[in-house]
Amino acid sequence: MSQFSFTKMHGLGNSYIYVNMFEEQIPEEDLALVAEKVSNINTGIGADGMILICPSDVAPVKMRMFNNDGSEGKSCGNGLRCVAKYAYEHKLVEDTVFTIETLAGIVTAEVTVEEGKVTLAKIDMGAPRLTRAEIPMLGEGETPFIRENFLYNNHRYAFTAVSMGNPHAVIFVDDVEQAPLTTLGPVLETHEMFPERVNVEFIEILNEEEMNFRVWERGSGVTQACGTGACAAVVASILNGKMERGKEITVHLAGGDLMIAWTEEGNVLMKGPAEVICRGVYEYKIEA
């Protein structure tokens, strides 16, 4: 029987099991199965996945994230805010501004601290990727993929594709509560045009500075929030002429609000909370 200490944290209800790999050891070959086991709501702790906080050669810390199906993702906005909180509060970093390595690249985090606790984290998510090769999508072309039709159940849905280090398909609807989240979501997620699968967002524009947001996450299904998805939604809204670049947009997710801005300089900034749920020790056994 093996075990490791963990901290369960959430960003707007998007919860992960966080493991400090500066102190813990999980064999590389076991990571996918451990992520699946620990995320199981019935036989594990229950979460949207597992995130490892690891040493890095190019930044103070490195984030590796695994979905609850065991697949490894390249980035996670809500996860990055929680990693920033953990790293600062556990003295893995000294300054309130620092970098975090991800499989999608290096991002910059800035934490707001009150009485030694991080109350808010802002992440510079970098520039969005908009070509088919960068997303990735099948097909050729260097222009952004904006409002292309997808036929499902005799209805045409127009989506815009954006990568924030992971792929997103953003669909505008009149009412997110009536959106085909659990039906169209998994169909588009696994469509052959997306070789690495895709996260699917449904967006309801409220005004020039607010939107409602629901998400079907690649490898996790319906979740309360998706930070990279919120970033992709704002980028897609600006590409479609629905919002103005440079303004801070309030994204209303099922779990709460994020503040997102696509700056004139090109990067996307995400600001929001990160919370600790509980801490403990998880025991597991890998069958031979």
Swiss-Prot record:
GO terms for cellular component: cytosol. This is Diaminopimelate epimerase. The keyword Amino-acid biosynthesis applies. InterPro entries: DAP_epimerase_AS (IPR018510), DAP_epimerase_DapF (IPR001653). The lineage of its organism: Bacteria, Bacillati, Bacillota, Bacilli, Bacillales. Catalyzes the stereoinversion of LL-2,6-diaminopimelate (L,L-DAP) to meso-diaminopimelate (meso-DAP), a precursor of L-lysine and an essential component of the bacterial peptidoglycan. Its EC number is 5.1.1.7. Homodimer. Pathway: Amino-acid biosynthesis; L-lysine biosynthesis via DAP pathway; DL-2,6-diaminopimelate from LL-2,6-diaminopimelate: step 1/1.
